[in-house]
């Protein structure tokens, strides 16, 4: 059975999401991201992100949860009424630990949410960017979608098998990438792209699909392994110029 993916739901006001604010380049958090953060049902900040949130305190809400190993937070910062969650495991990144903790709350507590939206994680240090993509692949089979939003892109992992992606064409430049992130040859077929693939072998160091283009609001992907799907947002979307 084909898996239905609706990543653009996170940009709707009615979407009940967890927002995770990552430490990273300040420019990665756009006006749109701030708006999503303020409207999120649950706001979760990694410890390093608290310093940046504090700088924006006049126009962003304080987090409900602050989590991490607390090696990046300014020790003088008052956590106020946020719940502090220590996640000291050094084998995983703050993002992976935060996503795992949120998914556990959905199972163990009364938390209810439709998506996990990650703010940032694609700008700045390259190794941090790769760790973000690794985290997406780690949770690709979760029943709760994990979607990364930075100052220009919307990025998610696509699972093995058949997937149908709903794309809001008006919100994008239509430029997209289908990246075989796993370290093995990945066989991909597609419907709804300018440069279609039919049982095409994608692999790092060989052929990958970048600067492709979405042509319809429904994109079908069939893959032998997990993929990263990225799409570029229109300027007005992430800058909120239209609101």
UniProtKB/Swiss-Prot annotation:
UniProt family annotation: Belongs to the thiamine pyrophosphokinase family.
Spell out the reaction equation it catalyses.
Answer: thiamine + ATP = thiamine diphosphate + AMP + H(+)
The name under which this protein is listed is: Thiamin pyrophosphokinase 1
Top-rank lineage group of the source organism: Eukaryota
**UniProt keyword terms in alphabetical order:** ATP-binding, Kinase, Nucleotide-binding, Transferase
Q: Gene3D superfamilies, alphabetically?
A: Thiamin pyrophosphokinase, catalytic domain
Cite the CDD domains for this sequence. Answer: TPK
Q: Which is an annotated GO molecular function term of this record? A: kinase activity
The role this protein plays is: Catalyzes the phosphorylation of thiamine to thiamine pyrophosphate. Functions cell non-autonomously.
Q: Which Pfam families match?
A: TPK_B1_binding, TPK_catalytic
Entry annotated with the keyword Phosphoprotein: no
Give the metabolic or biological pathway. Cofactor biosynthesis; thiamine diphosphate biosynthesis; thiamine diphosphate from thiamine: step 1/1
Record-level GO BP terms: thiamine diphosphate biosynthetic process; thiamine metabolic process
Gene name in the database record: tpk-1
Q: What is the effect of changing residue 67 to Y?
A: In qm162; maternal-effect mutation. Partial loss-of-function. Prolongs embryonic and postembryonic development, increases lifespan, reduces brood size, reduces the rate of pharyngeal pumping and increases the defecation cycle rate
Q: What is its EC number?
A: 2.7.6.2
